């Protein structure tokens, strides 16, 4: 059996500190790298007319002018290939079906649509279900429904992707107050304001 002395252990502990100091003392200049991705998202800048697959678009004004409770109401009435199932009895938690592929809040149902808000995937990590009531439909600036399977949109994008962008101070440079009432005592009040500072 080999016995390790205290000085050997001390040298083994202290030696990485000297290496780190030497590495930290050197300055390295790295060139910038630009990465481009060919998706139909307007934030990236590729025109929708140049995309080689079906893309349906809607603006926030079109969505808000449509009678209904949620964004699903607009989609079923205005976008081709979209149907809605009310499986949970909640108008804010609908199962959206696009060409046979679902985006549903129910765990266990097969999913095939990827949902993005401002480039952040809204499908839950393990079940891929979508909690539609967490998406603020009043804050949507524009929306694109992209058909077909595309690996650019991530795992489980079998039938398509729904990409939404929300308002910002640059796109919504005003203030607005909105009040809605409906059946069964439903009341909704919204106040929104946006703008960009000159500073």
Predicted ranges, named:
Residues 26-28, 77, 81-95, 155-158:
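Short, glycine-/polar-rich solvent-exposed loops and beta-turns at beta-strand/coil boundaries
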Residues 97, 163, 192-194:
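Outer-membrane beta-barrel architecture
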Residues 122, 133-178:
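A beta-strand signature from Gram-negative outer-membrane beta-barrel systems
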Residues 156-158, 180, 185-189:
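Residues that define the transmembrane beta-barrel architecture of outer-membrane proteins
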Residues 88, 93-147:
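Periplasmic plug
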Residues 24-64:
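Short, acidic, small-residue-rich periplasmic hinge/interaction motif at the N-terminus
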Residues 94, 111, 160, 173, ...:
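Hydrophobic, lipid-facing positions within transmembrane beta-strands of outer-membrane proteins
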Residues 55, 63, 75-76, 142-145, ...:
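Non-catalytic regulatory/gating segments with a bias toward low-complexity or hydrophobic composition
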């Amino acid at each position: 059996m080999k016995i390790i002395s205290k000085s050997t252990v001390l040298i083994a502990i202290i030696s990485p500190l000297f290496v780190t100091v030497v590495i930290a003392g050197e300055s390295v200049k790295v060139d910038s790298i630009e990465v481009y991705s060919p998706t139909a998202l307007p934030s990236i800048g590729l025109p929708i007319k140049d995309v080689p697959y079906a893309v349906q678009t809607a603006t926030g004004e079109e969505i808000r002018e449509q009678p209904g409770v949620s964004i699903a109401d607009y989609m079923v009435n205005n976008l081709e290939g979209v149907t809605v199932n009310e499986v949970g009895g909640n108008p804010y938690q609908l199962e959206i079906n696009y060409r046979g592929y679902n985006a549903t809040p129910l765990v266990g149902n097969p999913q095939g649509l990827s949902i993005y808000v401002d480039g952040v995937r809204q499908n839950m990590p393990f079940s891929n279900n979508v909690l539609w009531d967490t998406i603020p439909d009043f804050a949507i600036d524009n929306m694109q429904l992209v058909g077909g399977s595309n690996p650019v949109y991530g795992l489980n994008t079998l039938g398509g992707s729904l990409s939404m962008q929300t308002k910002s101070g640059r796109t919504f440079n005003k203030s607005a107050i909105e009040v809605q009432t409906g059946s069964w005592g439903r009341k909704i009040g919204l106040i929104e304001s946006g703008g960009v500072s000159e500073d």
